[in-house]
Amino acid sequence: MIEQDFICYDSFESSGIVEWNSPSNIALVKYWGKKQNQIPQNPSISFTLSKCYTNTVVEFKPKKNTQNEIYFTFDGKENQDFEKKVNAFIKSIDKYFGFLKNHDLYINSKNNFPHSSGIASSASSMSALASCLVDIESQITSNDNNFNLRKKSFISRLGSGSASRSIEGPVTLWGKTNAYKESSDLYAVNISHEVDKIFHDYNNTILIIDPGQKVISSSLGHELMNKNPFSNKRFEIAKNNTARLKNILKSGELDDFISITESEALMIHSLMLSSDPYYILMKPNTLEAIYKVLEFRRETKLHLSFTLDAGTNVHLLYPKSETEIIKKFIDN
């Protein structure tokens, strides 16, 4: 599919309410660096985080004035920073939704996890909003479910690249790669049918090291890759790791899975350390948690591993079959 496939001129005048819960996700092969128009420099693979989600409600009404209006609240309260971002996003995608020019939108979003703390809140929030808009459009179109999923991912990407991976799951790929025939830079695809069953209910526990906002936004982090001296090598490694991870996910080989995902996590943080200006995303307790994971794995031979997002928090990954012992370790 190409961009023109997602342009819709059809419109209508009606009132209604749509609601959507959309999960966050954690990348295994990381997306870090982009071209124009939210096109990734390399493919990425992620697990969806079903228990970390954004709830978004969109009420639409025929516009009251010549210019349509967009009203946004976060958890029921006005938030001018978020409202500006949402307004800019919706205005940037109006050519893909014919109904937008005829309607005022009243949007409320809320997360069940800390915002801007390294859990991908932009992924869940943008994908939830995109899903609501496509659901509104579906009232006047005859597009099938597969097309609607693609469009939801496509629109999500324009708001936040990683959001494209939050539409489906539990295992999702975004970015063109020879390793997957259906892959695209424009939207993410669900690859769960190509992975071993052990990864369908793989566990993720998030250690909140610091609930505050990230040191640097993901957008600025991507921008810094444009002049990072190691960027080209990084993109090459990520492309190779995507192909390698495809085979690992299919075979269910956990030791190799751990090797790639932990390497990817540390590489992203090392890239930020080598950027100009540089940023230290970890906190002392982040490193302490990582050391404890490595020690636990050496002692028990269980498959507890870690990955990181662009923040201080640690995502612990482990198979469901090992939950009982690993949960005791985490709780202590």
Indicate residue ranges for each PLM-predicted region.
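C-terminal nucleotide
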Residues: 1-27, 33-37, 194-332
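Short alpha-helix boundary/capping segments
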Residues: 78-81, 120-124, 230-233
